[in-house]
Amino acid sequence: MVSYHICEYQDSDYKSVVDVFTKGAEEYIPSTFRHLLLLPRTLLLLLGVSLALVLVSGSWLLAVVCIFFLLPFLWFLAGQPWKNYVSKCLHTDMADITKSYLSDRGSGFWVAESGEQVVGTVGALPVKEPPSGRKQLQLFHLAVSSQHRGQGIAKALVRTVLQFARDQGYTDVVLETSTMQIGAVTLYLGMGFQKTGQYFPSMLWRLVGIRFVQLNYSFPSA
């Protein structure tokens, strides 16, 4: 097994961090496309368009050709939520990681390195308006490069955030992830996180039928 270590982010890591984060998000486009194709409303759309064309033109061939033309549009639709998410992050908190995550003692950003290469990332920021009596830290951007999965890196990064939160006196660590990221949800639940809710963050996510799951880890002493 390849060795790795976790350390605090440095500005020299930026390009590698963006690469790991972007690839980690966009790798869900194919599975989102398959998920979208199997949604009842998508199947009804494809069937409805096909039948309408057959009734109007009398040609099944035209109907089949039309479906093949619709598939690229559905692929585009499946990719838009992920691309928009990446773009939003790169223009907000990840535009300047040092400023966003390392300018305050209550936040942090870490990378996992293997052979002097960044292979994993995770960040954490305090929740601005936590529930009364709670001090919450939100976990962001957990990602591990595809070549280095199955080595416990993601779990180690989450543990780094949990230990940081405990040391800083937080009562909870919260996060959001999508229902499409099954491996991530399984990881969090296995580490003691609890589901607290789910929702569609935008109309685009609703169109592709993917919800965001909200999870919470409360420290026993809290």
From Swiss-Prot:
Main location: endoplasmic reticulum
Gene Ontology terms, MF aspect: L-lysine N-acetyltransferase activity, acting on acetyl phosphate as donor; N-acetyltransferase activity
Location(s) in or outside the cell: Endoplasmic reticulum-Golgi intermediate compartment membrane; Endoplasmic reticulum membrane
Entry EC number(s): 2.3.1.-
PTM comment text: Acetylation on Lys-99 modulates enzymatic activity.
Transmembrane region(s): 43-67
Family: Belongs to the NAT8 family.
UniProt name for this protein: N-acetyltransferase 8B
Organism of origin: Rattus norvegicus (Rat)
UniProt gene name: Nat8b
